[in-house]
Amino acid sequence: MIALIAEKPSVAKDIARIIGATGRNDGYLSGNGYMVTWAFGHLIQLAMPEAYGVANFRRESLPILPPDFQLIPRQVKAEKGYKADPGVLKQLKVIKEVFDQCDRIIVATDAGREGELIFRYIFHYLNCRKPFVRLWISSLTDKAIREGLDNLQPGERYDNLYLSAKSRSEADWLIGINATQALSVAAGQGVFSLGRVQTPTLVMICGRYLENRNFVPAKFWQLKAVTASGGINFTAQSTAKWEQQPEAIAALQRVKDAGQLVVKSVERKEACQEPPLLYDLTTLQKEANTKLNFSADKTLSIAQSLYEKKVMSYPRTGSRYIPEDVFDEMPERVALLGQYSRFAGYAAGLDGTPLNRRSVNDGKVTDHHALIITENLPGELSKDERAVYELVAGRMLEAFSGKCVKDVTTALLSGGDTDFTVKGSVMKEAGWRAVFGEPETGGDEEAASLPPLQEGEYLPLSGVDLLEKQTKPKPLHTESSLLAAMENAGRELEDAELKASLKDAGIGTPATRAAIIETLFARQYIVREKKNLVPTDKGLAVYRIVRDKKIADVEMTGMWETALAKIEAGSMDADMFRKGIEVYAAQITAELLSVQLSIANGETCSCPKCNNGRILFYPKVAKCSNVDCTLTIFRNKCDKQLSDKQIVELATKRKTGLIKGFKGKNGKAFDASLVLDEQFNIGFSFPEKKAKPKK
């Protein structure tokens, strides 16, 4: 008997159908010599500190460095603390019974780092010793599954992948647990989550936010001239930018006095734009955020759904290339899109022509190739699924299309000792840009086309204007720009060799970056304002504490990512990595514990009760910094969360302004002011009802 374990029930059922295991049982399918069971994501996790006899959030317990990590079933919240998920316990029992009855195991969890870890943790937790082989496929079509089953890989081939996943999991535990507890102990109250990748990501968001907010724009002036040649009007802008307005006005007058412009030079050239590479997950997430306003997490979820519906390849890929053998199938995929209404016309024109090979490179394919559609046309899809499918399908057509070719003309004009420049372009061959029919957006200075200007030609000056402009700050991060910053964090480093080594690793991985961003939302460190990511007071408070600490070091985080990639490649020892990460965990713990701090933002005031301390703000309360003072103000009042500003007003004036939206025990909303009485208890003051006018 052969056991087969998939990552989730839907995948297990698809594989079971193909291998003839159609008998339904509780937690598994059977038949034709197979027993097919499943996990549902991570069933096993690393045990928390209490499993090692360590008291949580105690200075003397830190750093927590377990000699050997224990594995436990996935936990869920209970009335007191956490307990094992009953559904997980039940399925683990089924998996153990299936494994016990079989001679060998086929591992059919997702073909990636997390899929490998899901199986290996179950395997080790159950103390299983059965031999196993690996089903390694890049799509869930029947054809891919059959080919994968005919070409099962030795389980040990993926030992390094497992060691890398295990090392990542343990590193995240060591850094996250120790840093979170150290900061929380130092703060004195509340729990403030930190993480190996989470914290550098927060620092990037906060740093950009503060840079944007504190930016002081500087004015400058440019000239815009209107002229014509051969009956065609066009505008040109001065190459100079004046920081002093009087200088710009003087230049304006000299141009007016000249009354004409002369063509100093004309450059004409053919510009070719290569088609974009195929999508990897991060590029798809960036594009979906920009074009569809989807979060990274939503895009990943939709891509996973399309993968499970057999219409898209494995989504968690970091490669933008396909190998030669997959490229051989692309003419059929292009022809298939001829049956898809959105792309039918373009695909028909591309069918039968030589496909562009820019995205084809065996050496640049990682565990999985770039995102492509499968041989199955989609049936019923949701609106969001169809939007993501069309991004991937359209990008495929773009990637395999010809270059976009333009004739570009750049002219330099002069008048009254001021030079002006103008650029125009004419499309010769749309190439890949014709897929979505989106024209390239040019800058302010680019015209659609220019007349045939000649060097030395004099042009009439129809008008000239003085333009007042100002410098602009870097924009706030969106999820798209943040993903790029995480992916290319190494490019902001000064050391060229380090840049090259970190380029492929970045901060986080394609599979984890969405979850990292969602964690920052869950921790209430950031919020969305339209498309922008904006830190909360809590997020900024944490940033101010950790911004110069090791845990926030982008370079260090990138180096750990590089080390994990080396473990996966078999060029670094996992035990050596573990020792290094333990030293790092001890360093950041000591660094955070040594800081004298409380989580408070700049808006605070003296304590009205003892007059010695200052009010410090925490997620659930505000309290006096004087340890002998008992003043505590809970943020939640009748289902209304008090802001720092309202608490300061209450402490300084003993009464707030009218606050709307309190909720009584009967569920009805009411408005009131809060009052701090002589005993420092908080009560309500209701607005006086206006007397009804007499009839």
Q: What feature does the model see in each segment?
A:
Residues 1-169, 173-175, 354, 473:
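Intrinsically disordered, low-complexity regulatory segments
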Residues 2, 81, 88, 125, ...:
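Basic, low-complexity terminal or inter-domain segments flanking catalytic cores
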Residues 9-16, 33-36, 40, 59-62, ...:
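Amphipathic alpha-helical transducer elements in NTP-driven molecular machines
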Residues 87, 93, 100-101, 140-227, ...:
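C-terminal or mid-to-C-terminal helical accessory/interaction module adjacent to the motor/catalytic core
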Residues 110, 291-295:
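A conserved hydrophobic secondary-structure block that centers on an alpha-helix together
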Residues 243-279, 285:
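Metal- or metallocofactor-binding catalytic centers and their adjacent structured scaffolds
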Residues 278-287, 372, 464-465:
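Short, hydrophobic beta-strand segments
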